[in-house]
Amino acid sequence: MPIGVPKVPFRLPGEEDAVWIDVYNNRLYRERLLFLGQHVDDEIANQLIGIMMYLNGEDENKDMYLYINSPGGAVLAGISVYDAMQFVVPDVHTICMGLAASMGSFILAGGEITKRIALPHARVMIHQPASSYYDGQAGECIMEAEEVLKLRDYITRVYVQRIGKPLWVISEDMERDVFMSAQEAKTYGIVDLVAIENT
C-alpha cells in the first residue's frame, strides 16, 4: 500500500458514530473499486484476486471496477489476475488511467468486453513476454525458453480472442514494444471506449 494512505470517516448503517478507515482497504473496496497502481507481482496479484473472490461471494450481481496504472510485471502473476477476472460472476470493468503496459495491458484487455475504458491521455503498450533467466545450465535455459514461448502463445491467443484481430497481426505486433494512445488502443480493440473530459 502507498505511504500516507488517506483515512475517511465511515459509518455502518444503524451505528451512531463514524470510524476512520483506510480509504483503500475498506471504503473503496466496499464500493467495488479496485486499483492496480504498481508493478504486477505475486503479492499484488494475490491481493487483487482475494478481493475479487470476496466481492464475488458477497454479491454476484454488482459489477467491479479495476483501475489500472501499471508498467506491467510478472507474467504468471498477471495471468492469474486475468483468470480471476474471467472466473468471477460480476462483470469486471477495466479503466486505464496513466499507463497499462505489458501485463497491465493484458489485464486491461481482460475486462468485460464493452466495459473496457481508457482515460483520454492514457497510454497502452503491448509486447511479448521476456525471460530473466540468463545464468544457468544450457538445458535449463532451453526449458525456460520453451516455457516463455508457451506463455507468449497463450497471451497472443487471449489477445486474439479479446481484441478480434488475426493471430498473425497480434503475433507480429508483439515482436516489439507497441505504444498506443487511448484512441489508438480503442481502434486496436484493447479498450472499447475512451472517456470524455469533463469541461
From Swiss-Prot:
It is an enzyme of class 3 (hydrolase). Its main location: plastid. GO terms for molecular function: ATP-dependent peptidase activity; ATPase binding; serine-type endopeptidase activity. One of its GO terms (biological process) is protein quality control for misfolded or incompletely synthesized proteins. It comes from the Eukaryota. It is found in: Plastid, Chloroplast stroma. InterPro entries: ClpP, ClpP/crotonase-like_dom_sf, ClpP/TepA, ClpP_His_AS, ClpP_Ser_AS. SUPFAM superfamilies: ClpP/crotonase. GO terms for cellular component: chloroplast stroma; endopeptidase Clp complex. Cleaves peptides in various proteins in a process that requires ATP hydrolysis. Has a chymotrypsin-like activity. Plays a major role in the degradation of misfolded proteins. Belongs to the peptidase S14 family. Component of the chloroplastic Clp protease core complex. This is ATP-dependent Clp protease proteolytic subunit. The gene is clpP.
